[in-house]
Each structure stands twice: as structure tokens, then as C-alpha cells.
């Protein structure tokens, strides 16, 4: 018996507003990948990371917008630019017939949330950090759902419609692949990560401490970032220097330990790999939010928190040697398996799918 004519379901039309650093762009890309049925337009800022990563995947629309630092309302040019950005986004939402907006916070979220709210379009905001950013704290009240990377962020967002989902990782992170580096099979490996922007201070600390680690038998894979002025200064067969890798998962899975900044994206990757770490929060991050992130991992036993202002070359050198002494052959208890298990417990495997389902529920 015929069930009648087939009804075609229109393709959902979404706007993703994510701009700036990998911490904003990569989680949004992960959520976009989890919505293959949707027609996604992307809102960004000229000359930022999204122009390199998004343009060949999704239609990219750009606006010029700054942050909320200082008394911006008292600066007429800033206020006028913000108002202009809101109206530009309103026109985009109408033209593309957008049904819902997803944003990962930051500067771009302000005009996106304001424009969507003014048109009655629902917004899902993802806040990856333990200390929500100023935009999140100010504008989350205008969002239909606020998805959190850390439950602790909810303390700063009373009365908001919250759901803890973790921080989404791109699908390629979970796909088996080889790191392709000439590292012997059983040697201990230290992975140094400075975040998507690199970290000159960490790079210099590591290079100064590295000779003792190399002499002890440690192999080092050092992701320096592309703006490192000292690249190439340390040469050793066990020291591998890379400015950037597109997929860090194979290196995380091969490493025994990591030295890292404490951006939410990097921490999500460390948790997914179950990799113990020494975390050096970026001291100039907005409101020192990386320290809030790092404290959660340290409290869980997954990491050691080492503030940059208090860390000397000698301290870093000795801490790494002490932690890896068992892997370097000493007949002592190995602390790393317990730390690795703690890191793994912080991982949310279906984070991207949870956020995608939040968006689907609004359509």
C-alpha cells in the first residue's frame, strides 16, 4: 500500500560564527562536520585563521569587529562599527534564511548573537574555557542554549540554559594515522606544544632544558609555532622540530608526556589521548583563563600546573626528568599511568555530536 507522496525535507540553514584562534575555529569545524545534512554559512573576520581553514569548505562572510575591552561604549567609532556589524549580520541572516546560529564566543559572537536575537533566531553558544569570556558572560542570556566545555564555567553563568558537552574535536583526530617521524619504537617521547599560535617563552625554556633530557635518552618532538625566532638553533638526532602539524593526534598517541599551554582545545586533545602533561598557562590570556583550565586538570591528577613566571630552566629540567625517570630505565614507580588515566576521564568522546543535536533540537 502506498504511503502517499514523499515529502522532501528542506536542508537546515545555519550560520557559524567562529573567528580568531584555533580555540574558537577548530571546535566549530568539529560541530560543522557533525552536521552533514545542514547548509552552513560561516561568519568570520578578515585575515584571521578562518580565512585559511574555512573558505574552501563553507561560504565565508567577513565583518570587521573588535572586543569589549575598556569603556568601548564611550568610544563612538567602536560603537558605530559594532552597530554596523550587527546590521550587516542581520542582512546576512535574512538573505541566507538562517534558522539557527552557532558561535564559539570571542569578538565575532557579539554581532552574531545580537543580530540573531533581534530577528528571533535561536543561538547556541559554546564556551570552552573554565572561566567564560566577557562576551559569553554578557550575551549568553540572549542564547537559547549555552554549551560548556567545563562544568565549572557554570558558576559564572547563573540562570543560563546550560549543558556540559566538553570541547568538540575534529573527526580527523579520531581517525587512525601515522606520525611519519623517525622515532624508534620503544623510546620515551616528550611532546612540546605551544598552542595554535606557538609559544616563544616555552620554546626557549625547552631548548635550554633539552640537553639534559636528550643525554638521559629522551626523544623530543617540539611543535614551535610558525613565529619562532630561534628555530633551528638546537640540533640533535633525538630532537625533532616542527612548526605545525595538521593533525596532532598521532603524536599525542605516541608521546609519553607533554609540555603544553592550557588552551581548552589543547586540553581536550590531551584528554582524548589520555596523555599526562605539565601545563604552562599563557600568562597574557584574557583574564588569565588558561590558569583556570589548567587547575581543573591539575586537581584531577591529569597534569602538573607550572606558572610561567615561577618556572626556571632548572626546575623544568628536573621536573621532566623526575616524571620520566621510570620510562628512562630507573627501577622506581612510574607516575605516568595514573596521570594518563585521570586525563582520559576528562574526555567527552561525543562532544561534537552533542552540540550538533542541540542545534537540531532548535530547528
Curated annotation (Swiss-Prot):
**Record's catalysed reaction(s):** di-trans,octa-cis-undecaprenyl diphospho-N-acetyl-alpha-D-muramoyl-L-alanyl-D-glutamyl-meso-2,6-diaminopimeloyl-D-alanyl-D-alanine + UDP-N-acetyl-alpha-D-glucosamine = di-trans,octa-cis-undecaprenyl diphospho-[N-acetyl-alpha-D-glucosaminyl-(1->4)]-N-acetyl-alpha-D-muramoyl-L-alanyl-D-glutamyl-meso-2,6-diaminopimeloyl-D-alanyl-D-alanine + UDP + H(+)
Q: State the CDD domains in the record.
A: GT28_MurG
Record keyword ATP-binding present? no
Q: Which residues are UDP-N-acetyl-alpha-D-glucosamine-binding?
A: 21-23, 129, 170, 196, 290
Q: What is its main location?
A: membrane
Q: Which domain of life is it from?
A: Bacteria
GO BP terms, alphabetized: carbohydrate metabolic process; cell division; cell wall organization; lipid glycosylation; peptidoglycan biosynthetic process; regulation of cell shape
Q: Which GO terms describe its cellular component?
A: plasma membrane
Subcellular location, record wording = Cell inner membrane
- What's the stated role of this polypeptide? Cell wall formation. Catalyzes the transfer of a GlcNAc subunit on undecaprenyl-pyrophosphoryl-MurNAc-pentapeptide (lipid intermediate I) to form undecaprenyl-pyrophosphoryl-MurNAc-(pentapeptide)GlcNAc (lipid intermediate II).
UniProt-recorded name of the protein: UDP-N-acetylglucosamine--N-acetylmuramyl-(pentapeptide) pyrophosphoryl-undecaprenol N-acetylglucosamine transferase
